[in-house]
A protein has these predicted regions:
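Flexible low-complexity loop/turn motifs enriched in small/helix-breaking residues
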Residues: 1-8
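Short cysteine/histidine-rich metal-coordination sites, predominantly Zn2+-binding motifs
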Residues: 48-60, 118-128
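Short, compact, well-ordered microdomains
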Residues: 87-136
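Short metal-coordination and nucleic-acid-contact micro-motifs, chiefly zinc-binding Cys/His arrays
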Residues: 26-31, 97-100
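Short Cys/His-rich "knuckle" micro-motifs
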Residues: 42-47, 114-117
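Short Cys/His-rich Zn2+-coordinating modules
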Residues: 8-20, 48-51, 58, 63-67, ...
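Short cysteine-rich clusters marking metal-coordination/redox-active sites
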Residues: 30-38, 104-107
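Short Fe-S-cluster ligation motifs
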Residues: 66-76, 131-136
Length: 136
């Protein structure tokens, strides 16, 4: 995994990456990938042990380093919920404004990852980037 500081991405940059990283409909692209993230179309908990670190390349971040306290406000204009697979990927809203962006080196799938810090727990979460859902 790349440990250097990733570039800050806006919605347009994330959309370009997502469009370039969408697995094709070829038979090879439909095979299960060793990353095992293809099913994470909504936010999914993932332990450090399950995170496919060797396959993932950090390609950017949605976390603005100038914002010390990004908003916890969510954006659901169509009435979706946080955990819905069709919820918009609104880069300036929670939880996306706390995400790093990764690409799988095996299948080219683009995923978002952030850590939820609860009162008594730490929960790493991941979601596949669907280009059709990316918004500002």
């Amino acid at each position: 995994m790349n440990t250097s500081s990733p570039p800050l991405l806006d919605a347009a940059a994330l959309l370009r990456l997502a469009q370039a990283s969408t697995p094709t409909s070829t038979p090879a692209a439909q095979l299960p990938c060793p990353c095992r993230l293809q099913g994470a179309t909504a936010w999914e908990s993932i332990t450090e042990e399950r995170w496919p670190d060797a396959l993932m390349q950090r390609v950017g971040t949605l976390r603005d380093p100038e914002l010390h306290e990004p908003t916890f406000e969510e954006w659901h204009p169509a009435g979706t919920r946080y955990d819905a697979s069709d919820a918009p990927i609104a880069v300036r809203h929670f939880p996306f404004n706390r995400c790093d962006v990764y690409r799988c080196s095996a299948c080219a799938r683009l995923v978002l990852r952030y850590t939820e810090f609860g009162g008594y727990y730490v929960d790493h979460r991941v979601r596949v980037v669907d280009a059709a859902l990316v918004t500002g």
